[in-house]
A protein has these predicted regions:
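Auxiliary tRNA-acceptor-end handling modules of aminoacyl-tRNA synthetases
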Residues: 53-73, 86, 95-273, 278-285
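Conserved NTP phosphate-binding and transfer environment spanning the P-loop NTPase/kinase superfamily
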Residues: 286, 409-553
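Hydrophobic anchor at the beta1->P-loop junction of P-loop NTPases
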Residues: 291-293
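Conserved lysine of the Walker
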Residues: 301
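Hydrophobic positions on the alpha1 helix immediately C-terminal to the Walker A/P-loop
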Residues: 304, 308
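Short beta-strand-centered segment that lines the nucleotide-binding/catalytic pocket of NTP-utilizing
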Residues: 314-332
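Conserved nucleotide-sensing/catalytic segment adjacent to the nucleotide-binding pocket
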Residues: 320, 333-376
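Glycine-rich phosphate-binding loop used to anchor ATP phosphates in small-molecule kinases
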Residues: 356-414, 464-478
Length: 553
C-alpha cells in the first residue's frame, strides 16, 4: 500500500492526499491548477523551493509564477545557467561574469581576450535558443561540500572553490545541463524549455542579458540607457581592484587573513574621496545655490548629506541642510494609494508650492521660517528655525524626491546641482551569482526600523514591496538627471550587517508569509564572515543604521 501525505494548497485553498516523495510538479498536477506564467517555484511551509523538490511530510504549498519576485529570480538564474553553458560550448576557455543589474537586465562580462563584437553575441544567442529548444532537463544534485569543491577544482572554477570552502556548509547543491555543471544560490527551473523569453544584446564592452518584465512577463523589461549608473559600477570595480576583492570568496579569505581593518579603512577612505570630489565639483560651478540629494529608501541619504556638507565647508562654502521630510502636507491632505493607505511615497505628499516659495525667497536673500512635520500628529508646524542665505551659503536638501523636476519647477536650473545616492552592491558571490542591489538596502532598513522605530523585521519585510513600488514610480526614473552619483554601498558592509540582522531575521515566525524572505536573507548572509560593527569609524555611513554615529540625526 502506498504511503500518502496531506498537502494544503494556498492557491485554491484545497487539501489533497498525494504519494509520499512526490515532486512539487507532481503535486501541482494533482491539484489541476492553471498558471499562465508558471509554476516556476513554490513556497513550502513558507520556504521557497524549486519544482524538483520532493515532499515527504504533510505541508502547506503555494505555487509561484513569474509575477512573483521568487519566481522571477528562479527564471533569471536558469537563464544565467543556459548562457554560461552556451558560452562554454562555443568558447570553452572563456570566463563569463554575470556582473550587475542594469537597464532592466544584467550586464555580462565575457572575457574573450579581445573586444566583443555583434557576431559573438549573435552566436551565443543562437546557441542559447538551441539549448532551450532541445528541452534539456536541469538535474539537481546534493553532495558533501568537499565533494563539490573537488568537482569545481577539477573544472578550474577558482571563484566557486573559494566560495564553497568558506561557506561553512556541510552539503552543497549543484546543477547539470547535459554534462555542464554549475552552482547557483537559489532555486532553478526543471527544464530549459521553460525559458520562453529572453534577449541578448551587445552592451558597452560586454553583453546585456534581458529578462521578462515582472509586471508583464509576456514582454522583456524595457531597455533604458543608464550611462551614469553604469559608470558608478565601473568606478566601484576599480576600487575592488585596489583591494583585490571581487567576490565573497576573496572577501572571506581576506577576513581569515586578518585584513578586516584594512578593508574597512580603505573602503571608508575611497568613499570620502568620492564625496570630496563631488563637493569640489559643486564649488567649481559658479551660481549654484541649491544642492539636491536624492536616493531610494535606506541609501544613506542623511549621512551623505552631512558628509557632503562638511566637504563643502572645506571648499569655503557654508552649507545649510534641509530635509524634505519636513515639507509633508497635513495627513488629511495626503492622497491615498490603491489599497486606501496614505501614499507618502508620492511627490504630491509634499507641499511643492511652499518648497518653491521658500527656496526662491532664500535665494533672494530673504529670511524664512522652515516648517517642521510632526509624524505623530500628521501635522505641519512652524519650527522656529529661521534661515537667511548669504553669498557663500548653499542649501543642501535631501529627500527621496529631490531629483524629480516637479519639485523645483520654479527655480532657475543653473542654480541647482543634483546628486543621486544609492547602495549599489558590486561584490559577487562568484562569477555566476550576483547579489541583488536591493538586499543590502532591505537589511539596512530592517536594522534601522528595529533599532530606532521599534518595528519588527517581519513588518519591515511586509512593507518592502510597497516601498519598492514607490521607488520604481517616483525615484528611479529620475536618477539619470543627476550631475553626480554616489554609491553608498561599502565593500565590507554585508559582513557587518550580518551580525546585526541575523538575530532580527530569526525572530520572524515560520507561519507568516514574510518568513520566506527572512529565510532567504539568512541563507544569503551565511556566505559572509562576520565583522563586529564596533570596528567602524564614528563617521561611517553605516552607523546611520547600526548606531554609534558621531553625527546627530
Amino acid at each position: 500500500m502506498k504511503q500518502v501525505i496531506q498537502i494544503r494548497c494556498k492557491n485554491n485553498k484545497k487539501s489533497q492526499k498525494v504519494e509520499i516523495g512526490s515532486t512539487l510538479f507532481d503535486i501541482f498536477s494533482a491539484f489541476d491548477l492553471k498558471m499562465t506564467h508558471g509554476p516556476v517555484s513554490a513556497r513550502v511551509n513558507n520556504k521557497v523551493e524549486g519544482m524538483h523538490y520532493r515532499v515527504y511530510n504533510s505541508k502547506d504549498v503555494e505555487f509561484l509564477d513569474m509575477t512573483s519576485s521568487s519566481g522571477s529570480r528562479a527564471y533569471t538564474r536558469t537563464l544565467f545557467f543556459v548562457l554560461c553553458k552556451a558560452v562554454q560550448d562555443i568558447y570553452p576557455a572563456t570566463d563569463v561574469v554575470i556582473d550587475i543589474p542594469v537597464s532592466n537586465g544584467f550586464y555580462v562580462d565575457i572575457r574573450l581576450g579581445r573586444p566583443v563584437v555583434d557576431e559573438d553575441v549573435n552566436i551565443i544567442r543562437r546557441r542559447m535558443q538551441e539549448i532551450i529548444d532541445a528541452r534539456m532537463p536541469i538535474r539537481r544534485f546534493t553532495v558533501p561540500t568537499e565533494e563539490a569543491v573537488a568537482l569545481f577544482q577539477e573544472k578550474g572554477d577558482v571563484e566557486k572553490v573559494k566560495l564553497l570552502k568558506t561557506s561553512g556548509s556541510i552539503y552543497t547543491t549543484y546543477y547539470k545541463i547535459g554534462d555542464y555543471v554549475d552552482y547557483y544560490y537559489g532555486t532553478l527551473l526543471t527544464n530549459t524549455s521553460q525559458l520562453y523569453l529572453f534577449g541578448l544584446e551587445k552592451y558597452y564592452d560586454g553583453m546585456l542579458l534581458r529578462i521578462p518584465s515582472l509586471k508583464n512577463p509576456d514582454v522583456l523589461g524595457e531597455m533604458t540607457r543608464q550611462d551614469k549608473m553604469f559608470e558608478i559600477f565601473k568606478e566601484h570595480h576599480r576600487w575592488q581592484s585596489i583591494l583585490g576583492i571581487r567576490t565573497v570568496g576573496d572577501f572571506n579569505q581576506a577576513i581569515d587573513a586578518n585584513h578586516s581593518t584594512d578593508i574597512i579603512n580603505i573602503s571608508e577612505a575611497l568613499q570620502e574621496k568620492k564625496i570630496a570630489k563631488i563637493a569640489e565639483e559643486i564649488a567649481s560651478r559658479k551660481g549654484v545655490k541649491l544642492v539636491l540629494l536624492a536616493g531610494p529608501s535606506s541609501s544613506g541619504k542623511t549621512t551623505s548629506c552631512k558628509r557632503l556638507s562638511i566637504q563643502l565647508a572645506v571648499n569655503g562654502l557654508k552649507p545649510l541642510q534641509i530635509s524634505l521630510d519636513d515639507y509633508f502636507v497635513d495627513r488629511e491632505k495626503t492622497l491615498k494609494d490603491a489599497s486606501g493607505e496614505y501614499d507618502y511615497e508620492s511627490i504630491y505628499a509634499l507641499d511643492l508650492d511652499l518648497i518653491n516659495e521658500q527656496f526662491n525667497a532664500l535665494f533672494r536673500g530673504e529670511e524664512v521660517e522652515l516648517p517642521k512635520y510632526d509624524f505623530q500628529s500628521g501635522k505641519s508646524k512652524k519650527s522656529g528655525n529661521k534661515l537667511k542665505m548669504n553669498d557663500n551659503n548653499v542649501l543642501v536638501v535631501e529627500g527621496i524626491h529631490a531629483l524629480n523636476p516637479e519639485l523645483t519647477a520654479h527655480i532657475p536650473q543653473e542654480q541647482i546641482f543634483r546628486v543621486y545616492a544609492s547602495a549599489l552592491t558590486t561584490i559577487l558571490l562568484d562569477n555566476h551569482n550576483y547579489i541583488p542591489t536591493t538586499d543590502n538596502r532591505l537589511l539596512r532598513r530592517i536594522i534601522r526600523d528595529y533599532k530606532y522605530r521599534g518595528v519588527s523585521a517581519q513588518e519591515t519585510i511586509h512593507r518592502w514591496p510597497s516601498v519598492r513600488a514607490g521607488e520604481n514610480k517616483w525615484i528611479f526614473p529620475f536618477q539619470e538627471n543627476a550631475d553626480a552619483m554616489l554609491n553608498t554601498a561599502m565593500l565590507y558592509e554585508l559582513a557587518v550587517i550580518k551580525t546585526q540582522a541575523e538575530p532580527l531575521l530569526q525572530q520572524v515566525p515560520e507561519n507568516c508569509e514574510e518568513y520566506a524572505e527572512a529565510y532567504r536573507l539568512l541563507k544569503f548572509l551565511k556566505y559572509f564572515k562576520g565583522i563586529p560593527y564596533n570596528n567602524l569609524p564614528p563617521t561611517s555611513l553605516l552607523r546611520e543604521f547600526l548606531g554609534g554615529s558621531s553625527f546627530h540625526y
